[in-house]
């Protein structure tokens, strides 16, 4: 088991041997670059005519109407052997272009493209971060409280109908502009807080096992909550679905499954719901991808909701990849799901036809979620690996891929380090990247941990088309927390970045530190931004709201 605890280690002897290694001396080596070692594949959009033809066909057919991609399996899919646990047809339609019908941040990084964790528009005048409220969680043995990796909250603006029938405390049942923060904690509880004040809005749900990943809410605004369990401490390990009318558990799906090829049953990934199919999609650390028909029956007048899940499980084996397990949150473009595994292989899976389209070779553990960019109807993917299987030193591989063909558009390799042993703490890419929009359009921003030194970090921006570096920012402390882009009313862009010693940075869109605040403990979790507020959990047992002024 790979424990994700962001601990700062001092390892002078190890660093001495690492820094003297000729494989990490970049000038004059085969990895030469002024900052980043790079095996760059120049933009294949303009160079590979066969790929361009494929892209153009997809654009022509899909650009005008949001409909399922009709893709045939490519030769790389033959490197897979796969099966489904049954022939049940779970998905019949592509994920809708508009993921949700209610305001909120409902899954990790917002939705199927996994591209950002923000909502609303921010007004920034003083360019300063100020703490506004904090909430102290309880603690579990060995894991404490607060939030770990990925640990992003969901935020929802409930419609009045649901607000009235749920088990909210009375003062919140009729509160106007009510937004609720839903946060899974390492103490084994799901907490519910008022976004404005940080006060509890209802009693927590206790699963009695640490929650490391990010919870998810139903995009229809139905009072349904998905919770993945990170660590087994009591009872069985698996994923749970709860009613938010009364907090009751509606379904438990065990992670220890005889159908899987791996005996680790955690769920760190955040689920997605296809509201047109009443269906849910999530990957497990047991190596299975779960297609779940919910069969939801919701009667708000009677204050009742129930589900009758029917599950079809996808399993696979890939040549030259013996590592099973999906820790990232599955990304989806229409009917094509994308995920990476603990070996670093990346797959495209048609969830309607229930078959893989392509599968790229393994490299190294890839836990950061894949981010999708929709370019005129063609999906492009941005992804990166950790430094894990490579040992105590290696390269985080950063890639842009064509989501239709799996071909590499450009690639970078960034040097870094990892701590191995019984308590490994990996370097490389663990935070999920950002594909910019508006004033950040044309940029993709990655956050690399353990760069240059064991404690160092790197924030780096690339041109999405060419892969050329636009800017970089060296950070004194590494970060597993995902970067969030903040867009203002005056058409400016800022970045929010937490790090492993509790610093939260406000950074300009060109990579300059503007302001910072220390929140007292490691920020391993990924924040969300709602208007002027940044909400994030720390390993110090707190949820904290920071105001952007």
Annotate each predicted stretch with a short phrase.
Residues 12-13, 40-41, 467:
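Intrinsically disordered, low-complexity serine/threonine-rich segments
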Residues 95-121:
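Predominantly extracellular/luminal regions of secreted and cell-surface proteins
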Residues 2-27:
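Sec-dependent N-terminal signal peptides of Gram-positive bacterial secreted proteins and lipoproteins
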Residues 18-38, 43:
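Sec-dependent signal peptide cleavage junction
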Residues 3-5, 31-33, 41, 49, ...:
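Intrinsic disorder/low-complexity segments enriched in polar/small residues
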Residues 44-91, 115-267, 272-549:
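Extracytoplasmic/lumenal domain signature
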Residues 12-13, 22, 33, 248, ...:
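Intrinsic-disorder/low-complexity peptide segments enriched for small residues
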């Amino acid at each position: 088991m790979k424990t994700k605890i962001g601990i700062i280690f001092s390892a002078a002897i190890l660093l001495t041997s690492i820094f003297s290694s000729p494989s990490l001396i970049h000038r004059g080596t085969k990895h030469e670059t002024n900052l980043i070692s790079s095996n760059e594949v120049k933009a294949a959009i303009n160079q590979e005519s066969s790929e361009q033809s494929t892209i153009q066909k997809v654009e022509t057919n899909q650009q005008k109407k949001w409909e399922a991609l009709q893709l045939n399996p490519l030769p790389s899919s033959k490197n897979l052997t796969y099966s489904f646990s049954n022939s049940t047809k779970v998905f019949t339609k592509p994920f809708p272009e508009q993921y949700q019908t209610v305001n909120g941040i409902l899954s990790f990084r917002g939705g199927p493209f996994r591209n950002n964790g923000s909502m609303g528009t921010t007004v920034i005048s003083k360019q300063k971060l100020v703490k506004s409220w904090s909430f102290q969680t309880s603690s579990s043995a060995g894991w404490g409280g607060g939030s770990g990796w990925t640990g992003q909250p969901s935020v929802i603006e409930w419609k009045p109908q649901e607000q009235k029938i749920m088990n909210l405390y009375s003062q919140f049942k009729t509160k106007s502009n009510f937004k609720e923060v839903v946060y899974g904690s390492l103490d084994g509880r799901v907490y519910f807080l008022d976004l404005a004040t940080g006060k509890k809005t209802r009693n927590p749900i206790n699963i009695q096992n640490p929650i490391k990943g990010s919870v998810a809410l139903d995009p229809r605004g139905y009072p349904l909550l998905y919770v993945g369990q990170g660590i087994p401490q009591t009872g069985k390990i698996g994923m749970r679905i709860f009613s938010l009318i009364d907090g009751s558990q509606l379904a438990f799906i065990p992670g220890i499954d005889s159908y899987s090829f791996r005996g680790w049953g955690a769920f760190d990934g955040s689920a997605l719901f296809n509201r047109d199919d009443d269906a849910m999609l999530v990957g497990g650390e047991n190596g299975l991808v779960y297609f779940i028909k919910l069969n939801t029956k919701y009667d708000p007048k009677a204050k009742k909701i129930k589900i009758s899940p029917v599950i079809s499980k996808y399993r696979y084996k890939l040549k030259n990849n013996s590592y099973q397990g999906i820790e990232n949150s599955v990304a989806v473009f229409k009917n094509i799901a994308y995920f990476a595994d603990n070996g670093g292989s990346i797959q495209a899976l048609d969830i309607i036809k229930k078959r893989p389209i392509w599968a790229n070779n393994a490299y190294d553990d890839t836990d950061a979620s894949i981010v999708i960019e929709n370019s005129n109807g063609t999906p492009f993917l941005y992804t990166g690996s950790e430094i894990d299987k490579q040992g105590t030193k290696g390269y985080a591989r950063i890639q842009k891929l064509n989501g239709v063909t799996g071909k590499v558009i450009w690639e970078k390799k960034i040097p870094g380090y990892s701590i191995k042993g019984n308590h490994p703490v990996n370097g490389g890419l663990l935070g999920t990247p950002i594909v910019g929009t508006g004033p950040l359009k044309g940029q993709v921003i990655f956050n690399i941990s353990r760069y240059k030194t064991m404690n160092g970090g790197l924030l780096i921006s690339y041109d999405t088309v060419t892969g050329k570096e636009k800017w970089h920012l060296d950070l004194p402390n590494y970060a597993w927390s995902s970067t969030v882009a903040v867009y203002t009313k005056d058409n400016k862009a800022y970045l929010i970045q937490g790090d492993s010693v509790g610093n939260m940075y406000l950074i300009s869109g060109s990579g300059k530190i503007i302001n910072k605040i220390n929140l007292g403990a490691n920020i391993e979790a990924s924040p969300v931004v709602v208007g002027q507020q940044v909400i994030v959990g720390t390993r110090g047992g707190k949820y904290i709201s920071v105001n952007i002024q």
